[in-house]
Amino acid sequence: MVHGFDAAADTTAQEQSGPEAAWITRLGTPLQGASNGALAGLVFAAKDNIDVGGLPTTAACPAFARTAPAHAHVVQRLLDAGAALAGKTNLDQFACGLNGTRSPYGAVPNSFDASFVSGGSSSGSAYVVATGQVDFALGTDTAGSGRVPAGLNNIVGLKPSKGLISARGVVPAAQSVDCVSIFARTVQVAVQVLRAAMGFDAQDPFSRSLALEREPFGPRFRFGVPSELQFFGDEQAAQAFVQAIEKLQALGGAPVQIDYEPLAQAAELLYDSALVAERYAAVRGFFDEHEAEVMEPVRSILASGRRYDAADLVDAQARLRALAQQAAPMWEDIDVLLLPTAPTHYRIDAMRADPVQLNKNLGAYTNFVNLLDYAALSVPSSLRPDGLPFGITLVGPCGSDLQLAELGQRYHHASGLAQGATGEPLPPPADLGLSRPATVKVAVVGAHLSGMPLNGQLVERGAQLLEKTHTASQYRLYALPGTVPPKPGLVRVPPSEGAAIAVEVWQMPLAHYGSFVALIPAPLGIGTLQLADGSSVQGFVCEALATEGATDITHLGGWRRYIESRQPIAAA
């Protein structure tokens, strides 16, 4: 039992409208956590399918309400880290929806325009973060409930790798793919909360000990973009995504088209196969006795799980596994997947008029993520001409949570947006604690120079140009005959016989250096070059024997001058 509450919760459904609909239980005085800790001074809210000891857990269904005997594992960890709990927030009933209107406690509005949906199912959590009522909030995410509301409200939604945060004490939606998610106005706060919340829990059968990738994406990275995208007629959203691609390119990303079909087919399995039986199984004991007290369309979704048998479930799981294998090679071509968080916005009255199809549309780019065991981060991207937010989602393999956060923080700050709906500017970017990749400096002198035929071998390995400079005056440069593409040979000679040769110095991740060196054909190789400033770097060298019969081009000062000298002069 929890002490310190001075406000009791009324679990009788009293439909609210406007901002009041965001809360189901709001404490008069926040429940204080530890007096010190990583989260000291931060106030949070919990989605009301997450237990807080001594308070009712309703899952937005009054007939289901029960007083929680103890805190959910994640709530306890956050309190122990110093955060204070302000209350519990509204949701789509039993976390079954992506729009925020499926609750007897009221439809939660969008924080930018109250006539539009907030997104769900973690509707209240997103709203109270976006409007500055709390510093962060817990949601849950099975099909996008921790991402869609973030994208529609100009905030950050962190959907961790499955099992990274314990779900013990959370009312399950589909337990094998449920994740506790985090809403915040900045990536920095979301990562602070993640570090406090994560950890293996032996009492949660789906908890995992995961070693997170701690090396950020390099200055050059590849991001996937679906070859075909659907925005359901929303041209403003379509244009916003084009701009998002351009923003990610400006951060060093190279777009790569991917086949979205395996991901889309996996998403379809969530509700249109025997996998939906897991949603029914999650609340079967209650639902079989109280079906009439569950609101539509949640009732129909849960009831649909009854029509499948065990063989159907085995077939669906096999189909999902096949799609996972079909999608896996995508990660050989890209480092991260870029998607719209939601393809469009819908008005509340439109959603109520067509609750199934429009809800399905909102999940067009989220439903597959948990099924395929990926991590995801939704970050604000822009405000559309109509004033509504547009968010993007960065998706990566399991364990890429911190990598996504580092890139997401860079992207968020490049957007120039304010925090949520508060109008407050973003604070400066924070050090998220990732390790910088080990790198090596390599000087290139010929076909690997910027704009030359082999420069792509550097770029595709994440190498970054540091400077254009010269060697010390103790080298000679030769044009090697018979090389394709044409290449020079750099040979060290006594200072009295040499000259300074133009080079470019590139910085390359050490992890990719070996594969780069393996591409270098004889008589070329890698050695140590001395630069004009006296420093030494790795760089291209040539066997002296190979220069016999080669053209000495030292007097030109570099390979680029040599190539230019061979170009035909255009007639005046």
What are these regions (language model features)?
Residues 1-72, 94-97, 241, 346, ...:
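Short, well-ordered alpha-helical
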Residues 13, 58-65, 454-471:
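Short Gly/aromatic-enriched secondary-structure transition segments
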Residues 21-33, 159-242, 262, 406-434:
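A short helix-breaking turn/cap at a secondary-structure junction
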Residues 44, 50-53, 64, 77, ...:
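Gly/Ser-rich, acidic/histidine-flanked active-site/gating loops
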Residues 235-259, 283-289, 313-334:
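Acyltransferase
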